[in-house]
Amino acid sequence: MTTRQPLYKSLYVQVLVAITIGILLGHYYPETGVALKPLGDGFVKLIKMVIAPIIFCTVVSGIAGMQSMKSVGKTGGYALLYFEIVSTIALIIGLVVVNVVKPGAGMHIDVSTLNASSVAAYAAAGAQQTTVGFLLNVIPNTVVGAFANGDILQVLMFSVLFGFALHRLGSYGKPVLDMIDRFAHVMFNIINMIMKLAPIGAFGAMAFTIGQYGVGSLVQLGYLMACFYITCLLFVLVVLGGICRAHGFSVIKLIRYIREELLIVLGTSSSESALPRMLAKMERLGAKKSVVGLVIPTGYSFNLDGTSIYLTMAAVFIAQATDTTMDITHQITLLLVLLVASKGAAGVTGSGFIVLAATLSAVGHLPVAGLALILGIDRFMSEARALTNLVGNAVATVVVAKWVKEMDNDKLASELASGGAPLVDTRPTDDLGVAEGPAR
């Protein structure tokens, strides 16, 4: 009989308490809350420090260990098909909701009175985003540069090529694969150590958010925020829930399974902060390493459902608030632009805002200065974006794994039924051979 872990030792409880304390401190002592920003920034930087090597190890081990290269192409093809379908649904849902509810109607904002300088940096970054530029950026100038900059797509591309090359070498490349597998164990143990600081990071990030923007900013544009949060919730429960039911599992149980990762994301507003743990969690759920290694990292740029909902809602909200006419032609154009632009977002705080700036610049019909309207609440909306993105990528991993028959359904059922035990830090045995994330 196993002894139940005390509540105070649960990462879930620790992060939840830290977020609560951070909110209270930021509200009652805003200056102190703002000063705690480095705690949140430091934690996110620690996570980002190991994301590139973990993706490399996971993808290379998964691809090099596969029996056939055809299965890699099949997995990638199914993943991109799923991403495109579901993210398009998310864009359309956001567009429909904002047109029905009209959260910006009646504000009658004069664009000339807006402080365009406050969003100049975002607008400049957005103007540089082009489809060709995005595609070329997937190819790193140097391998070292890809890892040094922590660019997920660049690291992923090199990892796929490295995995293919290692697979072609057969037994000759086995020593290299073994070394990479053992290196993966080291990296996952580093993650386990870093995650002990998650409550401190979540506390600092939340205290800063409330201290900097205040609870008042939540009320100021609360209608838009409420619409967005409710839309994200309905998307998760109805759309993703329907996809889950169609594939024989429950989205509620899946959310319960990744509850610790969701709380980390809630505290940091960045789905990227949970990426290393998601790789381990989804593999433990029963998905093959090759599927997890391709779907999760790729999903962080191509399957951002929460960001997709946000982009259409925010763009039309700005049009409504500034009395800018948006007929059906303009809205279809907006949707088509976002089908491409939304794939350039990444799972980091602020990327959605930059893509929104790029979209407004590309459409031309919408005032870029209107970004100033939602700048103050964007930080609060990023929580819902990041949470929806994380759940969306978890669902995508299970669904794609089922499509390509690389899912252990018995393991999936048992893990979801148990709620998932916390990831523990144990040392692998010398004869383990292949890394499988943190030891079970």
UniProtKB/Swiss-Prot annotation:
Keywords: Cell inner membrane, Cell membrane, Membrane, Symport, Transmembrane, Transmembrane helix, Transport
Pfam families linked to this entry: SDF
Coiled coil: none
Places the protein is found: Cell inner membrane
One cellular-component annotation, GO: plasma membrane
Keyword Transmembrane helix: yes
Family of this protein: Belongs to the dicarboxylate/amino acid:cation symporter (DAACS) (TC 2.A.23) family.
Protein name: C4-dicarboxylate transport protein
Species name: Pseudomonas putida (strain ATCC 700007 / DSM 6899 / JCM 31910 / BCRC 17059 / LMG 24140 / F1)
Encoding gene per record: dctA
